């Protein structure tokens, strides 16, 4: 242990992972950070190995991906781990964000930690989309065509931006080269931001379910919380092994098994399941430009939460109104995911429009309203309690 504290590099790891003081009452909802770190390592390692065999060419990309699964030693394992690892990464990411929303982890003094996390979330979405396009299958080709066309919503220079991104007049070899290069780079950027996220977190320490400062009641990270983290990591390993060996393509669309055909449009163009809520928001607004703005705002609104929530009580643990509306928001988010994966028929478009409206009403109206109402009730109750 003395060596861990005397060596400057090991001392840094010791301060963050072994001797770090953590609130004694944090629950398993605080384990998603370690799970995300574990999955990120898996994604980087498998991604580097897959890149050794991938060919960024419209003619050979699909064949190279199939060859990885058929001819490369343990290639099927690498491919399944990488594909399903992305899904697990988003599962843990959404749960991590949901825990932060529920317990008010975006409130001061952890606003910087929250903002870095939102940037990581946005970059993760971009990285996932880039990787989704690389196999050059039927769904990814048309998904790349549709999503990259969103840049045409930029006034005056939109069409030029699309052609610059494509490297031509359609999704082709230059497009795959650009996407492959960026997809290889982005995980390392996310890893660097994750370290910044960790540094910002340890500046003021972790929050806790009670939402109060707990500087006097803390325990060292090792062994108490490391053992706790290992439990959820082992559960994750069991889950991803089940998906890899028993249902490796469970999260994929059937059209992902077909090579790209520029002359034939799929019956329904949908992104991966973890991007469906934002795709539903895009489709819910008839105006193209406003739909793109709404989709982007639905992510960036998380940066405004520290300003929108000024409640005297941190989090929803002791806030009945906040708790009720939070679970309404969770249900609304699930409805958006369902609508995003459905055919764009009138009934689904209508439901998506109402769900999209509630999504923004929750952030811009409900949170400030029940915050003001809650603060007012607290102010009215304080004189009575003092008496």
From Swiss-Prot:
Coiled-coil boundaries: none
One of the record's GO molecular function terms: ubiquinol-cytochrome-c reductase activity
Subcellular localization: Mitochondrion inner membrane
Spans traversing the lipid bilayer: 32-52, 76-98, 113-133, 179-199, 225-245, 289-309, 321-341, 348-368
InterPro entries reported for this sequence: Cyt_b/b6_C (IPR005798), Cyt_b/b6_C_sf (IPR036150), Cyt_b/b6_N (IPR005797), Cytb/b6-like_sf (IPR027387), Cytochrome_b (IPR030689), Cytochrome_b_N_euk/bac (IPR048259), Di-haem_cyt_TM (IPR016174)
Single GO BP term: mitochondrial electron transport, ubiquinol to cytochrome c
Cofactor: heme b
Keyword Cytoplasm: no
Membrane topology: Multi-pass membrane protein
Record-level GO cellular component terms: mitochondrial inner membrane; respiratory chain complex III
CDD domains noted in UniProt: Cytochrome_b_N (cd00284)
Keywords for this protein: Electron transport, Heme, Iron, Membrane, Metal-binding, Mitochondrion, Mitochondrion inner membrane, Respiratory chain, Transmembrane, Transmembrane helix, Transport, Ubiquinone
Binding site for a ubiquinone: 202
Gene3D superfamilies according to UniProt: Cytochrome Bc1 Complex, Chain C
PROSITE patterns: CYTB_CTER, CYTB_NTER
Assembly mode: Fungal cytochrome b-c1 complex contains 10 subunits; 3 respiratory subunits, 2 core proteins and 5 low-molecular weight proteins. Cytochrome b-c1 complex is a homodimer.
Name of the featured protein: Cytochrome b
Species annotation: Schizosaccharomyces octosporus (Fission yeast)
């Amino acid at each position: 242990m003395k060596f861990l504290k005397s060596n400057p590099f090991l001392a840094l790891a010791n301060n963050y992972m072994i001797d770090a003081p953590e609130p004694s009452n944090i629950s398993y909802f605080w384990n998603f950070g370690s799970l995300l770190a574990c999955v990120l390592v898996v994604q980087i390692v498998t991604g580097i190995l897959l890149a050794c065999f991938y060919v960024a060419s419209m003619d050979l990309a699909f064949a190279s991906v199939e060859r990885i699964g058929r001819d490369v030693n343990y290639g099927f394992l690498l491919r399944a781990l990488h594909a399903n690892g992305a899904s697990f990464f988003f599962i843990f990411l959404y749960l991590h964000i949901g825990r932060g929303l529920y317990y008010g982890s975006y409130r001061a003094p952890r606003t910087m930690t929250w903002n870095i996390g939102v940037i990581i979330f946005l970059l993760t979405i971009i990285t996932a989309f880039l990787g989704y396009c690389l196999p050059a299958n039927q769904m990814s080709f048309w998904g790349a065509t549709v999503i990259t066309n969103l840049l045409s919503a930029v006034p005056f220079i939109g069409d030029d931006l699309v052609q610059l991104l494509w490297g031509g007049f359609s999704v082709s070899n230059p497009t795959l080269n650009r996407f492959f290069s960026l997809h290889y780079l982005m995980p390392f950027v996310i890893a660097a931001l994750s370290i910044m996220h960790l540094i910002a977190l340890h500046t003021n320490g972790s929050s806790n379910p009670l939402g109060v400062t707990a500087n006097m009641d803390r325990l060292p990270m090792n062994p108490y919380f490391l053992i706790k983290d290992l439990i959820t990591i082992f559960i994750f390993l069991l889950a991803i092994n089940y998906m890899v060996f028993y249902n490796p393509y469970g999260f994929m669309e059937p059209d992902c098994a077909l090579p790209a055909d520029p002359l034939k449009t799929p019956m329904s163009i949908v992104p991966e399941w973890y991007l469906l809520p934002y795709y539903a928001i895009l489709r819910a607004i008839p105006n193209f430009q406003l739909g793109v703005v709404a989709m982007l705002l639905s992510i960036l609104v998380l940066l405004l939460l520290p300003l929108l929530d000024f409640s005297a009580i941190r989090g929803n643990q002791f806030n009945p109104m906040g708790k009720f509306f939070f679970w309404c928001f969770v249900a609304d988010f699930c409805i958006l995911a369902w609508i995003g994966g459905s055919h764009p028929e009138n009934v689904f478009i209508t439901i998506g429009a109402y769900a999209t409206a509630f999504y923004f009403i929750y952030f811009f109206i409900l949170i400030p309203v029940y915050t003001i109402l809650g603060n007012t009730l607290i102010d009215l109750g304080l004189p009575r309690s003092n008496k």
